[in-house]
Regions:
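Carbohydrate-active catalytic/glycan-binding domains of CAZyme proteins
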Residues: 1-164
C-alpha cells in the first residue's frame, strides 16, 4: 500500500460551501519530521500580524513525532501561488520530554481577554499509545501564549508567558 500522504491545499471560496477557483497544492510532507509512520500535513491554523500571515499545520503521525510546522506569506501577495509561501525547515513546536508533553498538534488560534494571541492545541501526556493512536483517549487540550520575536515571527515555546 505504501505511505499514506496528507497534503494541504488552498483555493478561493465563492461561498462557505463552494470553491471559486481550482484547489492548489500548498504543502506536502517534504522533510523527515513530517514523515513518521504516516506522511502528514493536516489541521491548518491561521495567524496574522500586520502584513504577515502564518499558517501552522500538524505533521507526521499522532505519536511523539507529531509536531507543528509553519508556512508564512505576506498579505497582499497572491496566496494561491505556492511560491509566495515559505515553509520552515524545522517544526515550530514538537514534543518536550522535560515538560512531559508529547506530539503537540492540530492547533488553532484565539484571542484572550486582552486581545493577545493564544495557541490552542492537543498533545499527549504519555509516550506509549495503546491500540489505535487515532482513538487512544490520551490527548489533552493545552493553551500556549503566542510570543512575538524581534523578527516579527511567532515564537511557540512551552515556557511562553504573557507579561502582565
Amino acid at each position: 500500500m505504501g505511505k499514506q500522504i496528507s497534503n494541504l491545499y488552498i483555493a478561493r471560496m465563492e461561498s462557505a460551501t463552494k470553491l471559486a477557483t481550482v484547489q492548489v497544492l500548498l504543502t506536502t510532507p517534504d522533510y523527515d519530521w513530517e514523515r513518521g509512520e504516516f506522511w502528514v500535513n493536516e489541521g491548518p491554523g491561521m495567524l496574522r500580524r500586520g502584513d504577515d500571515l502564518f499558517l501552522t499545520f500538524s505533521a507526521s503521525d499522532t505519536g511523539v513525532s507529531y509536531c507543528v510546522g509553519m508556512l508564512s506569506a505576506m498579505s497582499g501577495t497572491d496566496l494561491l501561488d505556492p511560491l509566495n509561501w515559505k515553509k520552515n525547515r524545522h517544526p515550530v513546536l514538537s514534543s518536550n520530554y522535560d515538560k512531559g508533553i508529547y506530539g503537540p498538534g492540530h492547533n488553532s488560534f484565539v484571542k484572550d481577554e486582552k486581545g493577545r494571541d493564544v495557541m490552542v492545541f492537543h498533545a499527549r501526556t504519555e509516550t506509549e499509545i495503546v491500540g489505535d493512536p487515532l482513538y487512544n483517549p490520551n490527548r489533552h487540550a493545552f493553551l500556549m501564549p503566542v510570543v512575538w520575536g524581534s523578527d516579527g515571527r511567532p515564537v511557540f515555546d512551552f515556557d511562553n508567558r504573557f507579561e502582565e
